[in-house]
Amino acid sequence: MFKTLYSRIAIYAITVILFSALMSFLFTNIYYHFHLKASNDAKIMRTLKEAREYERTQKPKPLDTYLKHLGQMNYQIMTVNEHGTKHFYGETFRKNTISQSAIKKVLNGEDYHGIKNKPYAFFVTGFFDNETDNTVGIQFKTDDGALAVFMRPDIGKTFSEFRIFLAVLITLLLIISISLVIASTYSIIKPVTALKNATTRIMKGDFSTPIKQTRHDEIGTLQSRFNTMRQNLGQVDQMRQHFVQNVSHEIKTPLTHLQRLLTQLELTQNEEEKQLCINEMFEITNQVSELTKELLLLSELDNASHLTFNDNVHLNTLIKDIIRHEQFRTDEKDLVLFTELEDLYFRGNERLLHQAFNNLIINAMKYAPQNSMINITLTSTNHLIIFNIENDGSIAEEDAKHIFDRFYKLSDESSSNGLGLAITQSIIHLHHGSITLTSDDKTQFIVKLFI
């Protein structure tokens, strides 16, 4: 029954309508029994006493004719004489339930308040209870002795048309309400069903089909955010495919080269050529090893929940150590390094920060022209540390857009695997910092870390 949200909402709403109708009936019944019964009893008793007074003063003859006339005025009347003989006027009572003791009391001159004293019944409205005990009664004096007269309004006749009207009204109310509930439930569920179908498409790898935003409420917001999520997942999937292709290419190329060198090594007899092959194989294995290390580091950065950032890093010392370690690169290209480093500390992950600054410094040395200068500065302003590294030469605008993409290379001939700057950016972002590139006559990388 509740396998779909549509049936669940529709059944809940219909249940609420029916339950509300039932509770309304019960509370109305309670209200009648505890607030209206007494006043209803008093009004009918007053009418009956006025009828008795009229009969006493005007002496309409005979009494039977007078009571028949009252019966024709939509009253139900029962009379009982001292011998127990009963006569009925107007519509017939459904049940004759009045007790003999009540009849005797009325014959003895006591008033009978059966309407007011009618016992409360949970699912029965006493107002419509067509029984002789649900009446008021008084004593009439006749030439033949005392006569007990019991009377109640003929509700069935008085409200017959109204009851039909009320029944039609309630029936139409329920039919229209339930129909509208079903229709409105469908309008609510329709976009949810569309979302469900869209998630099924995404599970099957279809990220290209959007869903139409049809509303401006919470469901409309959900539709909008779902489309955003779909686009992001599509981008992630494209990046994943691109990443797998690049990794496959980066691994396949050196392996193919190694296979060729092994074949060449097996066939050559020249010792010098053999040594060249071996040296080249060592170089290729080192490249593959570096690629593996950087891929593992990227995986670590993508799942950074286990990383800690509590090291008190002396940035001045860290940068100087990198420059000293890479001194051979400056000697090879006759580079001149100008450094201006403030004595600054930063709380973070020292291993990762060393990797980030190392990548930036090595890149600057690697792509700087022969006999050129590299400027490195480390300064601080209001709650901000700024690292700036600048070398001669420029990067094309199209290349600059993708410089931080994984596996992006400025040149196919480059020995780089295109992961260094992507790793650097990830590390800086994990430290809640930023890294930007500007390039015109010179190329400049700017790292900002918040203290």
Curated annotation (Swiss-Prot):
Key words of the record: ATP-binding, Cell membrane, Kinase, Membrane, Nucleotide-binding, Phosphoprotein, Transferase, Transmembrane, Transmembrane helix, Two-component regulatory system, Virulence
Residues bearing the modification Phosphohistidine: H249
Gene Ontology MF annotations: ATP binding; phosphorelay sensor kinase activity
GO CC entries: plasma membrane
Transmembrane segments: 9-29, 164-184
Database matches in SUPFAM superfamilies: ATPase domain of HSP90 chaperone/DNA topoisomerase II/histidine kinase (SSF55874), HAMP domain-like (SSF158472), Homodimeric domain of signal transducing histidine kinase (SSF47384)
UniProt keyword Phosphoprotein present: yes
Compartment(s) where it occurs, according to its Swiss-Prot or TrEMBL record: Cell membrane
SMART domains, sorted: HAMP, HATPase_c, HisKA
Post-translational note: Autophosphorylated.
Superkingdom field: Bacteria
UniProt membrane topology term: Multi-pass membrane protein
First-tier enzyme category under EC: transferase
Stored InterPro entries: Bact_Sensor_His_Kinase, HAMP_dom, HATPase_C_sf, His_kinase_dom, HisK_dim/P_dom, HisK_dim/P_sf
Functional description taken from the UniProt entry: Member of the two-component regulatory system HssS/HssR involved in intracellular heme homeostasis and tempering of staphylococcal virulence. HssS functions as a heme sensor histidine kinase which is autophosphorylated at a histidine residue and transfers its phosphate group to an aspartate residue of HssR. HssR/HssS activates the expression of HrtAB, an efflux pump, in response to extracellular heme, hemin, hemoglobin or blood.
Protein name: Heme sensor protein HssS
